[in-house]
Curated annotation (Swiss-Prot):
This is Sterol 14-alpha demethylase CYP51C. The keyword Transmembrane applies. Itraconazole binds at residue 300. It is a single-pass membrane protein. SUPFAM superfamilies: Cytochrome P450. The keyword Coiled coil does not apply. Lanosterol binds at residue 115. It comes from the Eukaryota. Belongs to the cytochrome P450 family. Keywords: Endoplasmic reticulum, Heme, Iron, Membrane, Metal-binding, Monooxygenase, Oxidoreductase, Transmembrane, Transmembrane helix. It is found in: Endoplasmic reticulum membrane. One of its GO terms (molecular function) is heme binding. GO terms for biological process: sterol biosynthetic process.
Length: 517
């Protein structure tokens, strides 16, 4: 070793520095490989074999997470650890894994240490992941109060009108037929329907000007790099921070103006609900909390609905016979000429609901749910212990793509729900729990968990079904859709994006119906 050191000293820096660096890299690689092959830790889940210490399995996971999970499950079982950019990430698949992670005690694991870096610069401080878990659960309770069935009844006509106006006035739908990028179309439709229903007429009217730009700049804050380094001096982060401050002031001004007028009328939007809300301890909800929660509810669900809607319509375009079935179902349920779509008759559109469920099964926008381990956690039935240095990863979508639960799992077939609905229902064992925002099923054994489970289950589930259901029903009533190239396959998922959207070109051909009853 001394002779090597002396040799390196005699070399010029232009040679010794690259050579020394290469030696260090080679030694670290050799050490890493030897440790995995000959000195595995029997008290830890098996580690996915990798060559480069820091990179680990990052590339394979990033290219196709589901393929990576299934391949690792075949080799290592349901529980294994892989290296994600230097971080030991323990995956636990299946019902036991979902229960271990999603129903885990907050003292043992949490979500805020993972997601707080990403969401706090977008939503603001003191809300969501930038407050105590008890306060966050109370905030979810308040948001849920604005998503009742009575509220949804009021929202359905707004959803319908937004889609009708969009198809009538958007430059994407000029003439009687054309080709559109459905990802862009659904992004616009979902933000218009969400803002108009949840945030009221003032906000919706601003979406054609100032608000749309602010929203886009805030949206740019959802970049994967911000999971690790949210404060980087990047142009999009400067725009994100400015947009959040301006949007918060806009919401606060709307709240102040409404307090002055006090004229709610028939409006049932979330602003009216939050401006009069109280925390469980009796403290009135501060206006700046309300403003930041409004940003969170607008941003939090719009991406999922937009991506799911795009996948849904792309799949329908590949199966025109289902488009016709959906149209005929509306005629049968709503009559001809059709009566207005309401919450009650939306529930009667069975196939309309099934295309949503099948899309969420096969194209769940979130493939990985992460939690930071806070205290050592023993994996049930093993001697393995997951240490606090690890991140836990749950992937309910792997069950939804498993042959064990869904025959021909890679096939998009809404009619499968004609037969398997009871299977999903019976997976709930009757156990319930209240994390602070309402009683819910504790079971995580269902193979269909598109909205997650446990204390961080999405409170907007019913709203999402209603919004997407009304959008799809109205869209199909107005236009017929098909794929531009009958031989082209469905676009592949873009797993480099935050929400697994379809890769471009994600296009459909539309044709305006001759008569819209």
């Amino acid at each position: 070793m001394e002779s090597l050191y002396e040799t390196l000293r005699t070399l010029p820096l232009s040679v010794s520095i690259p050579l020394t660096t290469s030696i260090i890299i080679i030694l670290s690689i050799v050490t890493n490989v030897v440790k995995q092959l000959w000195f595995p830790n029997p008290h830890r889940p098996p580690v996915v074999f990798h060559i480069f210490p820091f990179i680990g399995s990052t590339v394979q996971y990033g290219i196709d997470p589901y393929a990576f999970f299934f391949d690792c499950r075949d080799k290592y079982g349901d529980c294994f650890t892989f290296i994600l950019l230097g971080k030991s990430t323990t995956v636990f698949l299946g019902p036991k894994g979902n229960d271990f992670i999603l129903n885990g005690k907050h003292a043992d694991l949490n979500a805020e240490d993972v997601y707080g870096k990403l969401t706090t610069p977008v939503f603001g401080e003191e809300v969501v992941y930038d407050c105590s878990n008890a306060r966050f659960m109370d905030q979810k309770r308040l948001l849920k109060l604005g998503l009742t069935t009575d509220s949804l009844r009021c929202y359905i006509p707004k959803f319908v009108k937004e889609v009708e106006d969009y198809v009538k006035n958007s430059p994407y739908f000029k003439g009687d037929t054309g080709i559109v990028n459905i990802t862009e179309v659904m992004a616009e439709i979902t933000i218009y329907t969400a803002s108009g229903s949840l945030l009221g007429n003032e906000v919706r009217s601003m979406f054609d000007s100032t608000f749309a730009t602010l929203y886009r700049h805030l949206d740019d804050g959802f970049q994967p790099i911000n999971f690790v380094m949210p404060g980087l001096p990047l142009p999009q982060n400067f725009r994100r921070n400015h947009a959040r401050k301006v949007m918060e002031k806009l919401f606060s001004d709307i709240i102040s103006k409404r307090r002055e007028t006090g004229n709610q009328g028939d409006e049932t939007d979330m602003i009216w609900m939050l401006m009069n809300a109280q925390y469980k301890d009796g403290e009135p909800l501060p206006d700046h909390h309300a403003a930041r929660m409004l940003i969170a509810i607008l941003m939090g669900g719009q991406h999922n609905t937009a991506v799911s809607g795009a996948w849904l319509l792309l799949n329908l375009a590949h199966k025109p016979h289902l488009v016709q079935e959906l149209y005929e179902e509306q005629t049968q349920v709503l009559g001809s000429p059709q009566e207005p779509l309401t919450w009650e008759n939306l529930q009667k559109l069975t196939l309309n609901g099934q295309v949503i469920k099948e899309t969420l099964r096969l194209h769940s926008p979130i493939h990985s749910i992460l939690r930071q381990v806070k205290s050592p956690m023993r994996v049930p039935g093993t001697e393995w212990v997951v240490p606090p240095s690890h991140t836990l990863l749950s992937s309910p979508g792997t069950m939804a793509r498993s042959e064990e639960f869904f025959p021909r799992p890679s096939e998009w077939d809404p009619h499968r729900w004609d037969k398997i609905e009871p299977l999903v229902k019976t997976a709930e064992d009757g156990q319930t729990v209240d994390y602070g925002f309402g009683v819910m099923s504790k079971s995580v054994s269902s193979p269909y968990l598109p909205f997650g489970a446990g204390r961080h289950r999405c409170v907007g589930e019913n709203y999402a079904y209603a919004q997407l259901g009304a959008i799809v029903a109205t869209f199909i009533r107005l236009v017929h859709i098909e794929q531009p190239d009958p031989k082209a396959p469905l676009p592949a998922p873009d797993y480099s994006s935050m929400f697994s959207r379809p890769m471009n070109p994600a296009e459909i051909r539309w044709r305006r119906r001759e008569t819209v009853e």
